From Swiss-Prot:
It catalyses: DNA(n) + a 2'-deoxyribonucleoside 5'-triphosphate = DNA(n+1) + diphosphate; Exonucleolytic cleavage in the 3'- to 5'-direction to yield nucleoside 5'-phosphates. Coiled coil: none annotated. This is DNA polymerase II large subunit. One of its GO terms (biological process) is DNA catabolic process. Pfam families: PolC_DP2_cat, PolC_DP2_central, PolC_DP2_N. Its EC number is 2.7.7.7, 3.1.11.1. Possesses two activities: a DNA synthesis (polymerase) and an exonucleolytic activity that degrades single-stranded DNA in the 3'- to 5'-direction. Has a template-primer preference which is characteristic of a replicative DNA polymerase. InterPro entries: PolC_DP2, PolC_DP2_cat_dom, PolC_DP2_central_dom, PolC_DP2_N. One of its GO terms (molecular function) is DNA binding. Heterodimer of a large subunit and a small subunit.
Length: 1145
C-alpha cells in the first residue's frame, strides 16, 4: 500500500488509532493465550487497504502485493480482471487443479470489485465447475447463490466477464447451450419475478439473447421452493427448483448493467461480446434521464404503489403543497440523506424524525431524514383562519393543537451530488436566497449585513429591486405558478374592489367575501401569509404583493393584464421587477422504515452460544437446564446435546474444551458418522470413504459444568435467567464458555451469532460537529486531536464548528448506555475469566468518549475501525460519509451496527459462525484500520463540499441539464482524491443549529396497534393539502389489508399445531390432545383473531373514504368467507315428515 496522502494532523490521527488498536490486540492475545477460546490469538485479521482485505477474505497468498502493483497503472475494474487472470494462470497463488484455480480467480476478482467488504465473493459464489459441451469441449459453470445480491448489479455482471477473461487465458471453450436450456432460463427468470423480486426484469427475447451468447454458464443453487413446470429434469441442470442467484446475475447483473459491461469489454478489446450492442439497443430503460428531460420531468408514482398501513404519505407526486426542492448540503445531509426543517417533523405528527426513511419520488428511491432548521418549514392554516409559516420547532409545538390544515409542508434539502449519483436531470431550482445573493452582489455596491439581507423588510426589498434592478427577494416572491390566469384576474379584481391598504403596509380584505368568492384559498395557494382579525384578512408588508398584481399603493390598476398564461411572467410584467419561480419543483414522499437505535439480538435472543436442547424450556434458560431431569429418577442436570468432541494429545482425556485440565491444547476427535469408528490422520473414513466429524450426541452433566462456571468467575448462583441456545449452528458444534454467558446475563447484554455484543443504529452522514451537540466540551475535543474550527480559528468554545475526522462516530445516548453495560461486561470478563486487568474502567458513558469501536454493515464481512467521540439524543448513528461508504452503505435508510473493539477481538471466533449459506455474512472476517477515500464506495466521491453553489449551477437547473455537465464547476470529493484535501476542509451550504432537533422517536414506533397507526395516517392525510386521502385509503387496503386478510385466511386452513412447552410442531393435532414428546398442550399457530384482525377497519375505511366498488366488493367477499369459516350457523335437524303436507300426514 502506498503512503496515505494526508496532512500531518491526519497522519497523527491515523497513527494514534492504530497504536491503540495494537495495544488492545496485545491485551486480547494475552487473554486468549490461556486457551479459553477456540483459537489462542485474535481471529480478526487487520487490513490497511483494499488489497489486504481481499487477501484476508479469500485467503490466496500474494494477492495483496499484486493488486497494489496493478492499481498503480490501471483502473479498479481492469485490475480485478487482470488479477483474476493471473490467479487462474498460476502467476499468483498455487492450486492443485484447474477448476480450483478458476474458482479462486473469480472470487479474487469479485472481492476486488467490491472493495473486499461484502460477503458475496465467498457466500454469493457457491462453487465453480467445468462442464462439457455437446462437442466434448469444456466450459465454465459458475454457481451463484442468494448472497450474490449484496455485490450489486455491476459486480455481478463483471464476475461473468471475469469468468470469460479467465477461461481465455487458460484455454477453456465457451458455453454452448442446448435449446431446452435456453427456454428453461426464460421460464425460470419469469417465475422468480413472481415468487421473489427483481429490480429489472428482461424480456423473453433479451433472456434468450444473453443465454445463447454468454460465454460462461450462469448456474446456481436452488433457493426457492417454486419449481419450473415446462423444462424439467434437464441433464445439465441439476434441479427443477428456481435458482435465485442465477436469476439475479442474469437480470440485475448482465441485463441491467449491460452498458457498463460493454465499456469494459471495449477497453479490454475482448471479442465475442458484440451481442451486448443488441441488448443495450433493445433494452427498455424504464424512463431514461434523456427521456425524462424531454418530457420536462413528469411526476413519478412508483414510491406510493405499495403503501403500508401506518406509514403516511406526505405528498402525492409533484403536487403543490408537497416538499419544495431546495439545493444544498448541510453538515448532516448528502450521501442519499436529505434535510427538512424540524418544525415540519413536528407538524407531520412526529412521523418523521432524524433517521426516518422516506420513500421519495426523486432523485433516488429513498432518503433518510435529518433536521436542518436553516431551510423553510411548513405553512399551515390555523383554526382561527391565520396562514402562518413555522420555521421554529418551539413554535411548532405551541401551535400544533391549533393547526387545521397543512397548506405546504416546507422545503426538502437535497444536494447536487445525489442527482449526480442517480444520473437524474437537474430539476429547476427555486429562486432562493443563495441565488438572489449572487444577483445582489453583481448589481449592488451597498454592503448590507447578511442577516438583514436574509430577512429584509418589504421597503428594502423594493428599493433594491427599483434602484439596482435586483430580482424581487424570495421572501416577497409568491407561488404565482400555482394559480392560473382566471384565478390571478379574480384575485386582482377582488383586491381592487374590496381591499384597503393602510399606511403601515397592511392589506385588509373582507373575510366573508373572501370565502364566498374563493379568494382565501388563492392566498393560501400563493403562500401569502396573513392573519384573520375582526372579520378581516390582514396581509402585512403587502406592497410587493400588491405591486405584483399590477396595482399601486392606492390599489388602482397600473396596467392591463399581459397576454400570457405564465403567471410568474405576468407578476413580473405588472410589477416592473424581475420575478422568478418560488417553487418550480416538488418532491413527493411517503414514510418508509422508522429510525432505529436498538440492541442487536438473535431470534430468539441468546446470551451464550451453549446448547441445552429443550432442557431449558421455551426461554432456553440455563438455570432451568441445570435443574432438568429427564424422568422421575433421572440425574438432576444431566442433558443430552450435540457437541464437538475434542481429545487431549497429552493425557488422552475426552472433552469439548479447547484446553485440557492438564494445560495442553486439545484437538478435534474425529469419527465416521456412519461406521462409528475413530478416524485419525485421514481426511475420509477408511471403511466407507465418508468425511469424518467430531460432532456427537453427548450426555453432559450440565449441573456440574454450570456450578463450576459460576465458581470460575466468582459469581453467586442468584440469576433467574441466562439464555442459551437449543442447538449450535456451526459445523464443528463449538460452544462458547459458559462463564461468558453468566457475565453477560449479569450485565444484561445479548450476543449475535459470532459471540459479539452489537448495537444497531440508522446511518446518517455527518461532516461537521460542535462539542455542545455531542454532550462533551471543546477541551475534550482538543484531547481527541481536534485543533481548529472550519474557519481556521483555534478551538476554544463549545459552539465552534469543526470538521469531523473520518473514523469518528457519534452514537445515540441509548447506544451509549448499552455500550457502557458491554464495557463493564468486558472488564468483568478480563478480570474474572481471563485473570488479566480491566480495560475500560468505565462508570458513566462519558468515560467511553474516545474508545475504539468496530462498525459493521449487514451482508458484509469487513469491519471498520472507528472512535467514539460523543452522543446524540437522536435515535441514529452519525458518522463521516467515508465511514459509511467503507462499509458499502449509503444513508438512504440503511442501518448498521457497532461493537466495542475489545469485545470484538476478544470474543469473535470464526468457529462460532453458522455452517450454512450466508453464515459468513455480517461477521468481521477482516478489520479495516485506515480509510482511504480512493477505496471507498464511489458514491461518496459524488458528495459536493463547497460553502455555496456557483451561480452557473442555479442557471443550469432551469435548463434541466444532466448533472454530469456541471461536474467541472462543482467542488466534489472526486476532485480532491489523491490530495490532503480529500480528508479535510470540507464546507457546507446550509447550517443547522442542532443536528438532533425534532421528535425523539417516530410516532410509528410510539403508537400502539396497527389500527391506531392507520387512523393517525389517515388523519394526517386529511390535513395535508398535497395528499389525496381517499387514494391513500384505497392503496392501503389494496396493498396491505386485503393481501393480509387473504393470506391469513389461507394460513388458517393450512396451519400446523404447536406444543406450548417444547415448541414441537405437528401437521395435525395428536389424537391424545397432548404433545407426544413432552406432554405439553398443543395449540393452534394461527388464531381466529389473526384472520379477522383487519376486517372491521377495512370495512369502515372503505365506507368512510368511498373507495372503488371493486375494492368494496372484495372486502364483502372476504367478510362472507371469514363468517362462513368461523360462525356456527345452527341448522335445525329436519325429519322426513317436515317435508310432507298436513293432509298427507
Amino acid at each position: 500500500m502506498g503512503e496515505t496522502i494526508a496532512s500531518e494532523e491526519m497522519h497523527e490521527y491515523f497513527d494514534g488509532l492504530e497504536a491503540r488498536l495494537k495495544e488492545a490486540i496485545e491485551i486480547a492475545n494475552r487473554a486468549r493465550a490461556q486457551g479459553g477460546d477456540p483459537k489462542p490469538t485474535v481471529e480478526i485479521p487487520l487490513a490497511k487497504d483494499l488489497a489486504d482485505r481481499v487477501e484476508n477474505l479469500i485467503g490466496v497468498q500474494g494477492v495483496a502485493a499484486k493488486i497494489r502493483e496493478l492499481e498503480t497503472r490501471m483502473s479498479r475494474e481492469e485490475a480485478a480482471l487482470e488479477i483474476g487472470k493471473q490467479v487462474a494462470e498460476g502467476v499468483v497463488g498455487s492450486f492443485p487443479t484447474k477448476k480450483d484455480a478458476v474458482e479462486a480467480a473469480i472470487r479474487v476478482s469479485m472481492a476486488t470489485l467490491t472493495e473486499g467488504v461484502v460477503a458475496a465473493p465467498i457466500e454469493g459464489i457457491d462453487k465453480v465447475e467445468l462442464g462439457k459441451n455437446d462437442d466434448g469441449s469444456q466450459y465454465i459453470r459458475i454457481f451463484y447463490s442468494g448472497p450474490i445480491r449484496s455485490a450489486g448489479g455491476t459486480a455481478q455482471a463483471l464476475s461473468v466477464l471475469v469468468g470469460d477473461y479467465v477461461r481465455r487465458g487458460i484455454g477453456i471453450d465457451r458455453y454452448k447451450p442446448r435449446e431446452e436450456e435456453v427456454e428453461r432460463y426464460v421460464e425460470e427468470i419469469l417465475l422468480y419475478k413472481r415468487v421473489a423480486s427483481l429490480q429489472y426484469t428482461p424480456s423473453e427475447d433479451e433472456i434468450r439473447l444473453i443465454v445463447r451468447n454468454c460465454p460462461v454458464c450462469i448456474d446456481g443453487d436452488p433457493t426457492e421452493e417454486a419449481e419450473v413446470e415446462g423444462h424439467r429434469d434437464l441433464e445439465r441442470i441439476g434441479t427443477n427448483r428456481v435458482r435465485g442467484g442465477m436469476c439475479l446475475v442474469l437480470a440485475e447483473g448482465l441485463a441491467l448493467k449491460a452498458p457498463k459491461v460493454k465499456k469494459h469489454v471495449n477497453k479490454l478489446k475482448m471479442d465475442g461480446w458484440d451481442w451486448l450492442e443488441t441488448l443495450i439497443g433493445g433494452a427498455k430503460s424504464g424512463g431514461s434521464a434523456e427521456d425524462e428531460q424531454k418530457s420536462k420531468i413528469k411526476p413519478k408514482d412508483k414510491y406510493i404503489r405499495d403503501l403500508i398501513a401506518g406509514r403516511p404519505v406526505f405528498s402525492h407526486p409533484s403536487r403543490p403543497g408537497g416538499f419544495r426542492l431546495r439545493y444544498g448540503r448541510s453538515r448532516n445531509t448528502s450521501f442519499a440523506s436529505a434535510g427538512i426543517n424540524p418544525a415540519s417533523m413536528v407538524l407531520l405528527d412526529d412521523f418523521i424524525t432524524n433517521g426516518t426513511q422516506l420513500k421519495v419520488e426523486r432523485p433516488g428511491k429513498a432518503a433518510a431524514m435529518s433536521a436542518v432548521d436553516s431551510i423553510e418549514g411548513p405553512t399551515v392554516r390555523l383554526f382561527s383562519g391565520d396562514l402562518v409559516r413555522i420555521d421554529n420547532i418551539k413554535e411548532a409545538y405551541e401551535l400544533r393543537p391549533q393547526v387545521e390544515s397543512i397548506v405546504d409542508i416546507g422545503e426538502i434539502l437535497i444536494n447536487y451530488g445525489d442527482f449526480l449519483e442517480n444520473n437524474h436531470p437537474l430539476m429547476p431550482s427555486p429562486y432562493v436566497f443563495e441565488w438572489w445573493q449572487y444577483d445582489y452582489e453583481a448589481a449592488c455596491p451597498e454592503k448590507t449585513p447578511e442577516e438583514e439581507l436574509k430577512n429584509p423588510s418589504s421597503a428594502l426589498a423594493l428599493r433594491l429591486a427599483e434602484e439596482y434592478n435586483v430580482p424581487l427577494h424570495p421572501t416577497f416572491t409568491y407561488l404565482w405558478h400555482d394559480i392560473n390566469r382566471n384565478e390571478f384576474e379574480a384575485l386582482r379584481k377582488f383586491v381592487v374592489e374590496k381591499g384597503t391598504f393602510d399606511g403601515e403596509g397592511t392589506l385588509k380584505l373582507p373575510l366573508t367575501a373572501s370565502f364566498e368568492e374563493g379568494i382565501k384559498p388563492l392566498l393560501e395557494k400563493l403562500l401569502v401569509l396573513h392573519r384573520v382579525k375582526e372579520d378581516k384578512i390582514l396581509v402585512e408588508e403587502a406592497l410587493p404583493f400588491v405591486l405584483c398584481l399590477g396595482l399601486d399603493s392606492s390599489l388602482k390598476e397600473k396596467a392591463g393584464m399581459p397576454d400570457t398564461d405564465d403567471m410568474v411572467e405576468a407578476a413580473g410584467v405588472l410589477s416592473g421587477f424581475k420575478v422568478y419561480p418560488r417553487a418550480p419543483s416538488r418532491i413527493g414522499a411517503r414514510m418508509g422504515r422508522p429510525e432505529k437505535s436498538d440492541l442487536r439480538k438473535m431470534s430468539p435472543a441468546a446470551q451464550v452460544l451453549f446448547p441445552i436442547n429443550n432442557c431449558g424450556g421455551i426461554t432456553r434458560n440455563l438455570v432451568s437446564a441445570s435443574d432438568y431431569t429427564s424422568c422421575m429418577n433421572g440425574k438432576i442436570g444431566e442433558i443430552e446435546v450435540e457437541l464437538g468432541l475434542r481429545e487431549c494429545p497429552a493425557c488422552g482425556k475426552e472433552t469439548y474444551f479447547w484446553r485440557c485440565e492438564c494445560g495442553e491444547f486439545t484437538n478435534p476427535k474425529l469419527s465416521c458418522p456412519r461406521c462409528k469408528i475413530d478416524v485419525r490422520g485421514a481426511e475420509t473414513c477408511p471403511k466407507c470413504g465418508r468425511k469424518p466429524t467430531s460432532v456427537a450426541n453427548v450426555k453432559l452433566d450440565f449441573r456440574s459444568v454450570y456450578k463450576q462456571a459460576f465458581e470460575n468467575v466468582g459469581e453467586r448462583e442468584k440469576m433467574d435467567l441466562i439464555k442459551g441456545v437449543k442447538r449450535l449452528m456451526n459445523g464443528q458444534m463449538t460452544p462458547e464458555p459458559l462463564e461468558k454467558g453468566i457475565l453477560r446475563a449479569k450485565h444484561d447484554v445479548y450476543i449475535f451469532k459470532d459471540g459479539t455484543v452489537r448495537y444497531d443504529m440508522s446511518d446518517i452522514p455527518l461532516t461537521h460537529i460542535r462539542a455542545d451537540e455531542l454532550g462533551i466540551t471543546a477541551t475534550k475535543l482538543l484531547e481527541l486531536g481536534y485543533r481548529e474550527d472550519i474557519y481556521g480559528n483555534p478551538l476554544e468554545r463549545d459552539d465552534q464548528v469543526v470538521c469531523l475526522k473520518v473514523q469518528d462516530l457519534v452514537i445515540s445516548y441509548d447506544g451509549g448506555e448499552y455500550m457502557l453495560r458491554t464495557a463493564k461486561y468486558v472488564d468483568d470478563l478480563l478480570v474474572k475469566y481471563y485473570k488479566v486487568g480491566p480495560y475500560y474502567n468505565a462508570e458513566t458513558i462519558q468515560d467511553l468518549v474516545g474508545v475504539l469501536l468496530i462498525g459493521l454493515a449487514p451482508h458484509t464481512s469487513a469491519g471498520v475501525l472507528g472512535r467514539l467521540i460523543g452522543f446524540t439524543k437522536a435515535s441514529v448513528g452519525y458518522a463521516h460519509p467515508f465511514f459509511h461508504a467503507s462499509k458499502r452503505r449509503n444513508c438512504d435508510g440503511d442501518e448498521d451496527c457497532i461493537m466495542l473493539l475489545m469485545d470484538g477481538i476478544l470474543n469473535f471466533s470464526r468457529s462460532y459462525l453458522p455452517d450454512k449459506r450466508g453464515g459468513k455474512m455480517d461477521a468481521p472476517l477482516v478489520l479495516t484500520t485506515r480509510i482511504d477515500p480512493k477505496e471507498v464506495d464511489k458514491e461518496a466521491h459524488n458528495i459536493d463540499v463547497p460553502a455555496r453553489y456557483p451561480l452557473e449551477f442555479y442557471r443550469a437547473t432551469q435548463e434541466i441539464k444532466n448533472p454530469t455537465e456541471l461536474e467541472s464547476i462543482m467542488d466534489l470529493i472526486s476532485g480532491r482524491l489523491g490530495t490532503p484535501e480529500q480528508y479535510e476542509h470540507f464546507m457546507f451550504t446550509h447550517d443547522t443549529s442542532d443536528i438532533a432537533a425534532g421528535p425523539l422517536n417516530s410516532s410509528y414506533k410510539t403508537l400502539g396497534s396497527m389500527i391506531e397507526k392507520m387512523e393517525a395516517q389517515l388523519s394526517l392525510a386529511n390535513r395535508i393539502r398535497a395528499v389525496d386521502a381517499p387514494d391513500v385509503a384505497e392503496r392501503v387496503l389494496k396493498s396491505h389489508f386485503l393481501p393480509d386478510l387473504i393470506g391469513n385466511l389461507r394460513s388458517f386452513s393450512r396451519q400446523r399445531m404447536r406444543c406450548i412447552k417444547c415448541g414441537e410442531k405437528f401437521r395435525r393435532p395428536p389424537l391424545t390432545g397432548a404433545c407426544p414428546k413432552c406432554g405439553g398442550n398443543v395449540v393452534l399457530t394461527v388464531h381466529e383473531g389473526a384472520v379477522r384482525k383487519y376486517l372491521e377497519i377495512s370495512k369502515e375505511i372503505g365506507e368512510r373514504y368511498g373507495v372503488s366498488s371493486y375494492t368494496r366488493q372484495r372486502i364483502e367477499l372476504l367478510d362472507y368467507d371469514i363468517c362462513s369459516l368461523f360462525e356456527n350457523h345452527k341448522v335445525k335437524q329436519l325429519g322426513l315428515s317436515d317435508f310432507m303436507s298436513g293432509s298427507a300426514r
